[in-house]
């Protein structure tokens, strides 16, 4: 997608980071919130817009009178308490700011579990659709109060990518406190802003550097990884300053602002997008190099003959990772057989399945229509 094609975007996810909504002292910046609301109202004319907003933890800390000690991160209960105290005020701020422009806001709090479950994912999609059809602006955040560390989405850059898949967005705009992605630390002399990134490479990831600030969870690296994930789904990602006036309208007018990450050539189906972005494999099917080539290069289904083993337990229809090296899954799909059944037919020809099991559901362990190649596992 070229920059000029951004003018044709009809469904947009806008992610606003904590650094954009707070001042240097960590206080909520209502003036910038009001300015962003005006720009969101402008770009929502003729488009459906979903807002993913950070800031609840920072706002809650301000309300509770808690200060973060430099170098000493808060424990999970403290973060959750801040989120609980801050989220109502965050919604009130957006409701008031967008309401001045005649827009109705709707709070949507999600967890990783909500999106990993196909049923709950589809329920969330139907809710989003009804809200967007009614002209509302869904305001999304992770439900930090109930999410546990090991099951958290973790940062709102990743959440924005997951939400984009849920609402089938054309583009994601991430508003941050810098003008875009630079080829090195922007504080260094000679740092160059990268306007257009055709593909997220290992070099691009290295240039993104380390973690977030004291007030935010994610850093540039989480944004770049989200852009890579979105690109694999056929969604364009833009990274631009949430402090620069009219950057968002300029982006959607095709002007040279921020950094634009080009999408892949093919858009995944709805089911494949969910498998790639939101689903979590309940086990791993280990395959040989020949099976990997058949799946990745030829778009084939996974047959028993290429299977070497199974890790974990899963049932028919469960998401399952496919890997040569179990630490680096290269694909994910929906299992046509349960884990114990796959163990019994591993390495066999399709004509031998019924003899081994006494029955046969399918020729394929994972059908190609229920399988997606994961870019993160490509060699």
Curated annotation (Swiss-Prot):
GO biological process terms, semicolon-separated: L-proline biosynthetic process
Domain PUA residues, every copy: 282-360
Annotated metabolic or biological route of this protein: Amino-acid biosynthesis; L-proline biosynthesis; L-glutamate 5-semialdehyde from L-glutamate: step 1/2
Residues the entry annotates as binding ATP: 15, 176-177
Short name of one Pfam family: AA_kinase
GO molecular function, one term: RNA binding
EC number: 2.7.2.11
CDD domains: AAK_G5K_ProB, PUA_G5K
Subcellular location: Cytoplasm
Keyword set, alphabetical order: Amino-acid biosynthesis, ATP-binding, Cytoplasm, Kinase, Nucleotide-binding, Proline biosynthesis, Transferase
Residues annotated for substrate binding in this entry: 54, 144, 156
GO CC annotations on file: cytosol
Catalytic activity: L-glutamate + ATP = L-glutamyl 5-phosphate + ADP
InterPro entries according to UniProt: AceGlu_kinase-like_sf, Asp/Glu/Uridylate_kinase, G5K_ProB, Glu/AcGlu_kinase, Glu_5kinase, Glu_5kinase/COase_Synthase, Glutamate_5-kinase_CS, PUA
Top class in the EC scheme: transferase
Record-stated family: Belongs to the glutamate 5-kinase family.
Annotated PANTHER family: GLUTAMATE 5-KINASE, ISOPENTENYL PHOSPHATE KINASE
Physiological role: Catalyzes the transfer of a phosphate group to glutamate to form L-glutamate 5-phosphate.
The protein, known as: Glutamate 5-kinase
Name of the coding gene: proB
